[in-house]
A protein has these predicted regions:
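Flexible, surface-exposed loop regions and adjacent strand-edge segments
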Residues: 33-34, 42-50, 89-96, 134-147
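Transmembrane beta-barrel architecture of outer membranes
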Residues: 51-55, 106, 161
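Outer-membrane beta-barrel transmembrane domain signature
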Residues: 80, 88-90, 96-108, 114
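Flexible, active-site-adjacent loop/turn segments at secondary-structure boundaries
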Residues: 1, 46, 102, 126-127
Length: 171
């Protein structure tokens, strides 16, 4: 990026946790990044770093029964703000990007059935909003050309994913 000068990074984060009721918890967090670098073309925000991030989580656990059996529910929301993209102005028009990416949101969830201290079954999903970055590879139609670039990934490239599993605890 032709660094010619100084760079700096400032960040601010605030987090709040709140127990709404027995077993019902929330967590919220906000993070702000201000990362800039002096380039030969002037001071610019660091590419592919969102200035704003927001996180929210809601979880609920039922009361434990015999053998510690219970249900657990967890939902997480993430907001990722716009990010400055590397300068592609000198590329041919079909390989030029906007100056900034779009902001986006992600939603994840997991549900767990606890049968005992030693055995659990869970099911969940990630990226339930199915957010995907369009064209994560620049000039993918010309992989041996000068404009081919796989480094400009600022958002998920896979859609929603589901999973399930078992947990066994061995004493």
């Amino acid at each position: 990026y032709n660094l010619d000068g100084k760079s700096f990074a400032n960040s601010f984060q605030v987090e709040a946790n709140y127990n709404i009721a027995e077993g019902f918890n929330t967590r919220f967090a906000y993070k702000n990044y201000d990362i800039q670098t002096d380039y030969t073309s002037g001071k610019l925000i660091k590419p592919l770093t969102p200035n704003h991030r927001f996180f929210a989580n809601v979880s609920y656990e039922t009361s434990k029964k015999e053998n510690d059996a219970q249900w657990k529910f967890d939902i997480t929301y993430n907001f990722i703000g716009e990010q400055r993209l590397p300068n592609t102005a000198s590329n041919p028009i079909q390989y030029q990007l906007e100056e900034y990416s779009n902001s986006y949101s992600l939603l994840n969830a997991q549900f767990t059935k606890v049968f005992s201290k030693k055995f659990e079954v869970y099911v969940g999903g990630e990226n339930l909003t199915n957010m995907r970055q369009k064209s994560p590879i620049l000039a993918s139609d010309n992989p041996f050309g000068n404009n081919f670039d796989t480094t400009i990934v600022y958002a998920p490239i896979f859609g929603r994913m589901f999973y399930s599993g078992l947990r066994f605890k061995i004493d």
